[in-house]
């Protein structure tokens, strides 16, 4: 059903991008109704406007808190054109019908993020704008609602193609967008008022990105969010559901490291990681940790990729490479494979909470942001680790924190030697790690072990000592801690307890 735009109400906080739309509407003979600063802006472009006050016969009140909250405005928006009683009341009360509403809301979230005072934040809670958006969206059969700058381009395309005429499906599209904007806005306000109490959960995302499929080809997949806030994709195919999971795991892991570090991940677990003075050294030693699992993996570095490192990386088949930058020559090399995904990370990603849908609800927890240092490592055995061994324990504990439980990490000299992850038995996780280390020719004498949770029995201590490992880190907290400590003392193993468990499921 086609509708003609004859009168537009325009009240916006941001004026950018509005001039082109105004020019097209004016060309079609559309009358402009506006408020305050928006009216001044429109008139500065040479277009006449009707002030909202001329329709309401009331001035802007209460310091601008009340402008459009009036039957003369809301009635002109909500009146149903095909409804006989509505049209009789339009004539009776002398209402001016409004066919298009362009409005954006006060920048509430930006004001909160700026650290503004509570008084300033309260004043950025939009009342009139929300009412205009909801009213116009409710009456989408007759009215077009443009609720944000993000919708200007779509409206401009319609005006250029068809003039001041819109179709029902277009108006319904804008109405859906309007309720997305209003619900997101109200959720942001609720979260601010709720603070840290978490009395209810309101999650919103302004963008939905369809994926090729979900975790498996028979599952549908969608990403809700805006990846462009953090990444620029420089090359490669579209990101998949599994890519995104590995990217999340990779980014959260690498952010715990300060020295030049390279990590390789498969199925959310690190299969290679090393910190070195140069990035190419870090890459070579990360790959050496498990060159078989690295095939088809997700790679991440915390330093820009140079030409020399790119030449080495190019020898490996991989899905994704993430780095804070790429030298031009490095990009030329890495772009040789058309499907290889290259992501430039623009800024760190810090989340306070993580969420998982479960049992018809949502399970939420604070993100695990604990990073143990040597100061938190309490020696509980007769033999104490050396400073070098303590340094390696910190490295290993950072990795075990990001590994699926039950998890054991073996490390030496800032290099991941092997890991056992996702095991139902902790001793099996250690057996897996020892076997992998031997398979790739690593000498475990001088290596350290970090466990994501306590040892329920002393069997892991015995097995580690038999393999040549003489330094262990674990959280402690088992009723049998004394057994593990006694076994360590008997075998000459140094053990520290961190007091922090790192389960990850």
Where are these regions (language model features)?
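N-terminal glycine-/serine-/threonine-rich phosphate-binding loop
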Residues: 1-55
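Glycine-rich nucleotide/cofactor/substrate-binding loop typically near the N-terminus or early
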Residues: 37-108, 200
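Active-site/ligand-binding-proximal alpha/beta "capping" segment
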Residues: 81-137, 378-387
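Cysteine/selenocysteine-centered motifs that mediate thiol-based redox chemistry or coordinate metal-sulfur cofactors
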Residues: 299-300, 306-315, 440-481
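Glycine- and Gly-Pro-enriched alpha-helical subdomains that act as flexible
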Residues: 271-291, 409, 413-461
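Active-site loops and adjacent core secondary-structure elements that bind or stabilize anionic groups
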Residues: 150-367, 389-398, 405-407
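C-terminal binding/interaction regions
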Residues: 318-341, 463-503
